[in-house]
Regions:
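Juxtamembrane helix-loop transition segments at the membrane interface in multi-pass membrane proteins
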Residues: 50-52, 123, 306, 353
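Membrane-interface helix-loop junction between the first two transmembrane segments
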Residues: 41-59
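Short aromatic-rich membrane-water interface segments that cap or initiate transmembrane helices
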Residues: 18, 69, 185-210, 268-278
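Short juxtamembrane and helix-loop transition motifs at transmembrane-helix boundaries
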Residues: 59-68, 123, 199-207, 264-272, ...
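Juxtamembrane helix-capping/reentrant segments at transmembrane boundaries
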Residues: 57-71, 125-132, 136
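Alpha-helical transmembrane segments
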Residues: 2-44, 81-110, 137-182, 213-423
Length: 423
């Protein structure tokens, strides 16, 4: 809105500031931070007055967080508001990529809110039916994938080269095309086209198959990252801290993809218009840092599924839009480890239970719970259980585990960016 207003002001002093992505991103980030801190305090007081708080804290199911029963939840509403307001004010609302991010926020925000509402007000600890969540994630994935396929505004320049001519750097771009090219790390040519996998289908059909694969992959990425973030949200400040770091890395990657100079330097696809994601992700990071003011240990509010599902979806969709989805296993390494730990633990336990052994890989999952669980706690609930990797007997404090996980995410985020130059 403000962006459009400044465009109308034309050549008035200061009006051209709004044409700079860096300026709008900084303003959006600061606005998100301030709104999150201010609204967080107001929201916490409101939830306490309405007695809207965590109620599902069973000592057998969640022995660590029994003391947190009564802490206000659904704080993800604050994060969403602190993201949307700066974006609506500072963003170019006609940009297709920004519109997709706003749709992502609203769809997953509604899904998460419905889940939290059922848990809090209906007393149903299962929350929203799992199939409804999956249906929502599939729908979002289809919207994103099909928009990237059919919107005339979604194009890319697969190659950008530069040379010096009369002491001036001249950039030459390949024709704007729709493409299923993506960036893959650790190879000489960073660009890989999904359509090439289906070359055996012929020149025409391989592109159709490539787009079908891309849409399916988009659905998978949306579901996987949003669920990974949801699993990571188990300690005070954990999900918000990790996601803020990932958000900063995505700001860098989006800026590179939307800037012709840096696209040439890093030899990645130039995606016109994707620089608008820098504004959105800046408000995303600002909102999360502001939320940490209240969510850091000891938490005064929880984000709930309203926050975690939305956060994960935003990360996944942003990566898909800038064609950096293959950097997500590294960038979101913590989310990946949390998800894999739950899947492996569940399958191994079921498999061994049928054979009368009752075996676990870790003491408890998601993985962050392993480091604050003692063998005594495991054996108290399951006396015959064996743990393959019990780890050290000394337990770690919640705040220390969060710090360690955030440091790991910081290292992984730096490595993900560095892969653009490692070939």
């Amino acid at each position: 809105m403000i962006y459009e207003l400044f465009n109308l002001l034309g050549d008035l002093p200061g009006a051209r500031l709004m044409t700079y992505i860096s300026f709008r991103a900084i303003v959006a980030g600061v606005m998100g931070l301030c709104i999150s801190i201010w609204a967080g305090n107001w929201f916490i007081q409101l939830l306490r007055r309405k007695n809207i708080s965590e109620t599902q804290r069973d000592e057998k199911i969640d022995p660590f967080n029994v003391a947190k029963k009564g802490v206000p939840t659904m704080g993800g509403v604050v994060i969403i508001a602190a993201m949307l307001i700066p974006c609506l004010l500072m963003g170019k609302l006609s940009n297709v990529y920004l519109i997709l991010m706003l749709i992502t926020t609203l769809i997953l925000g509604c899904l998460g809110f419905a889940d939290d509402y059922i848990k809090t007000f209906k007393g149903n600890k299962e929350g929203l039916n799992g199939w409804i969540k999956i249906a929502g994630q599939i729908t979002l994935g289809l919207i994103v994938g099909l928009t990237l396929r059919y919107s005339p505004e979604v194009v890319m320049n697969e190659r950008v080269t530069s040379h010096i001519e009369n002491n001036i750097t001249v950039f030459e771009k390949s024709p704007e095309v729709k493409s299923t090219r993506t960036t893959i790390p650790f190879v000489k040519d960073h660009n890989f086209n999904y359509a090439d996998v289906f070359s055996f289908l012929g020149e025409t059909n391989k592109y159709k198959a490539g787009w079908i694969f891309f849409v399916i992959l988009t659905i998978f990425v949306v579901a996987a990252v949003s669920n990974g973030a949801n699993l990571n949200d188990g300690m005070d400040g954990m999900c918000a801290g990790n996601s803020a770091i990932i958000g900063v890395a995505l700001i860098v990657l989006a800026y590179i993809s939307g800037n012709v100079v840096f696209s040439d330097y890093f030899d990645v696809m130039y995606i016109p218009g994707s620089e608008e994601l820098v504004v959105f992700m800046a408000s995303f990071v600002g909102a999360l840092i502001g939320f940490l003011w209240w969510n850091g240990f000891p938490a005064q509010v929880f984000m709930g599924d309203t926050g975690s599902l939305t956060i994960g979806g935003i990360i996944g969709v942003c990566a898909v839009i800038i064609h950096k989805e293959w950097l997500l296993p590294m960038l979101c390494g913590i989310f990946l480890m949390e998800s894999i730990s739950v899947i492996l633990q569940t399958q191994v336990y079921k498999f061994t239970k049928k054979r009368g052994m009752r075996m676990r890989i870790w003491k408890r999952t998601p993985l962050h719970d392993h480091y604050r669980t003692s063998m005594e706690q495991v054996l108290r609930n399951d006396p015959t259980c064996k743990v393959l990797f019990p780890g050290k007997s000394a337990l770690q404090h919640e705040s220390k585990i969060v710090l360690h996980f955030c440091i790991i995410t910081l290292i992984l985020a730096a490595l993900a960016i560095l892969t653009l130059k490692i070939r």
